[in-house]
Regions:
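A short, charged, amphipathic alpha-helix used as a generic interaction element across diverse proteins
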Residues: 19-39
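Short aromatic-glycine-(Arg/Gly/Cys) micro-motifs in beta-strand/loop hairpins
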Residues: 1-12, 41-46
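Short, mixed-charge low-complexity intrinsically disordered segments
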Residues: 34-67
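Generic low-complexity, intrinsically disordered sequence content enriched
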Residues: 7, 14, 29-32, 57, ...
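Surface-exposed loop/edge segments in extracytoplasmic proteins
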Residues: 13-18, 47-50
């Protein structure tokens, strides 16, 4: 699986979008103190896009690291 898009929704409803794992992880580290309400990860297997939703910062980081 390869990252297609990562959307980080902050507590103030601002949405940060990234298409790289490194940038997504950087956003998570930089914005964690501002409050993150959810992280939506779209990953592709080369044929289909699979979507994952997480409300946990730790789970989101782990999911991104596995891509």
């Amino acid at each position: 699986m390869v990252l297609h898009t990562c959307r980080i929704v902050l507590s103030n409803q601002q949405v940060l979008t990234s298409q790289s794992v490194e940038q997504s992880l950087s956003f998570l580290e930089d914005k964690a103190s501002n409050g993150i309400s959810k992280v939506e990860i779209d990953a592709t297997d080369g044929h289909q896009i699979h979507s994952y939703l997480s409300h946990s910062l730790e789970e989101s980081i782990e999911n991104l690291m596995n891509l």
